Regions:
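Short beta-strand
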Residues: 1-2, 114
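Minor-groove-contacting beta-hairpin "wing" of winged helix-turn-helix DNA-binding domains
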Residues: 2-12
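Generic beta-strand structural signal
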Residues: 7, 68, 120-121
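PLD-like (HKD) phosphodiesterase/transphosphatidyltransferase domain
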Residues: 15-88
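C-terminal regulatory/effector modules of DNA-binding transcriptional regulators
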Residues: 78-162
Length: 162
């Protein structure tokens, strides 16, 4: 008599595997939001963000949380990385103003073209938050984030002159 070993592992389809992981991450997010203490929403000082990926994530999150206006000045590649969030912002009825170096089309947004020789990026959200920095150095890129009104006003003037 031969005993056959039972199969202990059978790969699931990739789509099912991904759905399981996304579902688990969503559950973990909800648990963290329930369990972690709430934090103050306002940032009184200045925060330095390091790394291109982290900077892009902060830009995207700021756009998603905006309630009225977004002003962004960046190279075409940076604007392209933000396309989904900018499109969604226009869809929510936000005023979206983009200053970039190459032709870029986004229905409902106001777009200006200016010479953008470097990888500087500037974003103002709701006249309350500002992000400014450089994306040229990959993981060594840095960005300054603040909700200090004097810095927001300074960058509003700077964007008017671009």
């Amino acid at each position: 008599m031969l005993e056959d070993k039972a199969t202990r592992y059978t790969p699931v389809p990739l789509d099912e595997f991904c759905e399981n992981r996304v579902r688990r991450l969503q559950e973990l997010k909800e648990e963290l939001l329930r369990e972690l203490p709430s934090t103050s929403q306002s940032v009184d000082g200045y925060i330095t963000i390091k790394g291109a990926t982290e900077i892009i994530n902060k830009l995207k999150n700021t756009i998603v949380k905006a309630k009225a206006r977004i002003y962004v000045s960046a190279t075409d590649s940076a604007i392209e990385a933000l396309r989904g969030e900018l499109t969604e912002a226009v869809g929510r009825g936000l005023k979206v103003v983009i200053i970039t170096g190459r032709p870029f089309v986004l229905e409902g947004a106001i777009i200006y073209y200016a010479h953008k020789p470097n990888s500087q990026i500037r974003l103002i959200a709701d006249s309350q938050e500002v992000l400014t920095g450089d994306l040229a150095d990959g993981s060594n890129s840095t960005c300054l984030y603040s909700s200090k009104q004097n810095l927001v006003d300074l960058f509003k003037d700077a964007l008017k002159n671009e």
